[in-house]
Curated annotation (Swiss-Prot):
PROSITE patterns for this protein: RIBONUCLEASE_P
GO cellular component, one term: ribonuclease P complex
GO molecular function: 3'-tRNA processing endoribonuclease activity; ribonuclease P activity; tRNA binding
Official protein name in the record: Ribonuclease P protein component
Gene expressing this chain: rnpA
Biological role stated in the UniProt entry: RNaseP catalyzes the removal of the 5'-leader sequence from pre-tRNA to produce the mature 5'-terminus. It can also cleave other RNA substrates such as 4.5S RNA. The protein component plays an auxiliary but essential role in vivo by binding to the 5'-leader sequence and broadening the substrate specificity of the ribozyme.
PANTHER family: RIBONUCLEASE P PROTEIN COMPONENT
Taxonomic lineage of the native organism: Bacteria, Pseudomonadati, Dictyoglomota, Dictyoglomia, Dictyoglomales
The keyword Transmembrane helix belongs to this UniProt entry's keyword annotation: no
Length: 120
């Protein structure tokens, strides 16, 4: 696998995995509409993404998920190996207007705040 790939093993898929991260993880947020739960001490790095239906139609929700996945994929080498995270996007101000750079800035700030980035 390449350095910037996004393998299937790194995706949270099962409901029990999502619930475990919600239950055991700690929430981090920069706004009411963008919350990340990070669970440290996991066996391997994994991510799950949930976008509320009230955010918009499927096109909008899927675009937001693609943006989050792309930021994760590009920053994957810089994230710690022992974290599981769940990104939850709720309706809010300017959520539909998100672009790659806004998502990147938000995620990096939250990852720094949570200590999810590897020490350089």
């Amino acid at each position: 696998m390449g350095l910037f790939s996004f393998p299937k093993e790194e995706k949270l898929r099962k409901q029990e995995d999502f619930l475990r991260v919600l239950r055991e993880g700690r929430p981090y947020s920069l706004s009411k509409s963008f919350i990340i739960y990070i669970r440290k001490g996991a066996e391997k790095r994994r991510i799950g993404i949930s976008v509320n239906k009230k955010v918009g139609k499927a096109v909008v929700r899927n675009r937001i998920k693609r943006l989050i996945r792309e930021v994760y994929r590009l920053h994957r080498p810089y994230l710690r190996e022992d974290i599981e995270m769940l990104v939850i996007v709720k309706p809010g101000e300017n959520i539909k207007d998100l672009d790659f750079h806004k998502v990147k800035d938000m995620l990096i700030k939250i990852w720094e705040k949570a200590g999810a980035l590897k020490e350089q």
